[in-house]
Structures are given as C-alpha cells and as structure tokens.
C-alpha cells in the first residue's frame, strides 16, 4: 500500500515543506514547475491523498471512527500535501480533510 511504502519519505517531505512554504503549489500551466513539484513532494502528496481515500472507504464500509482517524492522519500528519485536480489546479489535503472530520474528533 502507498501509505506503508512511502510514509518515511512523505514525513521527510512534510518536514522540509513546513520549513519552507507549506502553501506552495506550482502554476498548473508550467510543466517544468509541476514536474519538479511532483519530484520533490510526490510522496507527501500521495500519502496524504491515500489517507483521505482510506477514510472515505472506511466511511462507506460503516466504520466512522476509523474513517475519522484516517482523516486526522491526513490533516495532522500531511498538512502540506496537495492533490492535483482535474481542472489543472491543486486541492489541499488539509482543507479537504478538515471538511471530512467531524467537529467532535480530537487528534490522538
């Protein structure tokens, strides 16, 4: 699974991005910038997205507590991650996760 295989690299990328500019995402019309972004932060983005998708799958399986924990991992551990959207821009893992976390959830 993506999460297991790339967590260590994603954590290092998250730490580096937190020190530089967590909000940075490339202009969608710059292929070179997008390619560089994916090369430098690919694991961070993929692992953050995987935690969100895992949460959605767990919700569908009727496991709301496990789903909330997965959303929490995405938001709190991969705060700086982004998901490329079909419109050419990026969605923030943090913002998407925050919309899915229930107000009663507390980060363990």
What are these model-predicted stretches?
Residues 4-7, 72:
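Alpha-solenoid helical repeat scaffolds
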Residues 6, 10-13, 17, 77-85:
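Alpha-helical junction/boundary sensor with strong preference for TPR arrays
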Residues 10-42:
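Acidic, Ser/Thr- and Gly/Pro-rich intrinsically disordered linkers and low-complexity segments
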Residues 40, 45-47, 87-88, 92:
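Residue signature of alpha-solenoid helical repeat architecture, marking inter-repeat boundaries
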């Amino acid at each position: 699974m993506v999460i297991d295989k790339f967590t260590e690299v994603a954590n290092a990328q998250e730490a580096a991005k937190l020190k530089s500019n967590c909000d940075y995402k490339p202009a969608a019309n710059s292929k070179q910038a997008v390619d560089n972004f994916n090369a430098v932060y690919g694991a961070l983005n993929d692992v953050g997205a995987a935690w969100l998708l895992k949460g959605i799958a767990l919700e569908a399986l009727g496991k709301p507590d496990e789903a909330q924990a997965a959303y929490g991992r995405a938001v709190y551990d991969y705060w700086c991650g982004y998901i490329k959207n079909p419109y050419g821009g990026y969605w923030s893992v943090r913002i998407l996760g925050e919309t899915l976390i229930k107000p009663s959830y507390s980060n363990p």
